[in-house]
Amino acid sequence: GLLDTLKGAAKNVVGSLASKVMEKL
């Protein structure tokens, strides 16, 4: 459903941000 899609998008965004942070460390 829509909620699941939003949850998936949120996980992708968090994962992308985490990857960027790890690259800077």
Curated annotation (Swiss-Prot):
Known function: Antibacterial peptide that inhibits reference strains of both Gram-negative bacteria (E.coli, E.cloacae, K.pneumoniae, P.aeruginosa) and Gram-positive bacteria (S.aureus, S.epidermidis, E.faecalis, Streptococcus group B) with relatively low potencies (MIC=25-200 uM). The peptide shows very low hemolytic activity against human erythrocytes. Wheel projection demonstrates the amphipathicity of the alpha-helices is low which may explain the low antibacterial potency.
Primary location class: secreted
UniProt superkingdom: Eukaryota
One GO biological process term: defense response to bacterium
Subcellular localization: Secreted
Keywords, in A-Z order: Amidation, Amphibian defense peptide, Antibiotic, Antimicrobial, Secreted
Family affiliation: Belongs to the frog skin active peptide (FSAP) family. Ocellatin subfamily.
Organism: Leptodactylus pentadactylus
Record protein name field: Ocellatin-P1
This protein's GO CC annotations: extracellular region
Residues with PTM Leucine amide: L25
Tissue specificity annotation: Expressed by the skin glands.
